[in-house]
Structure formats: C-alpha cells, structure tokens
Amino acid sequence: MTREALMSTFDDRENAFENKFAHDAQMQFKAEARRNKLLGLWAAELLGKSGDAAAAYATEVVKSDFEEAGDEDVFRKVSGDLGDRATEAEIRGKMIELMAVAKGQLMDEA
C-alpha cells in the first residue's frame, strides 16, 4: 500500500468516526428532548392539565433543559412544579424510564 493510499484510509476512518460521533450526539439530544416532552406530559397529568395546557407545559419542560448542562434543570422544574405530588425518587425514576421510551420511539422512527 502506498503512503497516499494509507493516508487516505486513515482520513476515511477519521471521517467515519467524526460522523458517528456527530450522529450519536444528535441522537442523544433528540432522545433527551423527547424524554423531557414525555416527562412534561406525565407531570402535566399529575397537575391536572390536559389538551393544549398539557402540551404547553411539556414545551416548558423541554425549554427548561437549555438552562444548564445535564438533567438537573429539568428535574428542578418538574419537582418545583409538582411539589408534594411526586417524590424525588418518583421523578428521577420516571426520567430514567422515559429516556428508554424516548430512545425506543426514535429507533422505531428511524
């Protein structure tokens, strides 16, 4: 194999890894946004919201994730709004459960 061919192979591998990384990051972002929407709909039901009010609340939950990196901003939003309607463990458990649901939905759509 010539030096040029070898370098081309390395460049191809590098591009493939970069593309996979970008795709994985995009899928994680979509999964988190979907999870947050589902969490918002779940919390909206506990708050007695339905229809457009539930959808609007779910959008608020999705937007709350842009405050800081990680899930704590979403947890704080939902926990603060729910008050004593759900425990910390229930909310965090629901976040984990709904992440799996969100990833499954995205895989089904792909």
Which residue stretches match the model-derived regions?
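A charge-rich, low-complexity, intrinsically flexible signal that marks solvent-exposed coils, linkers
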Residues: T2-A110
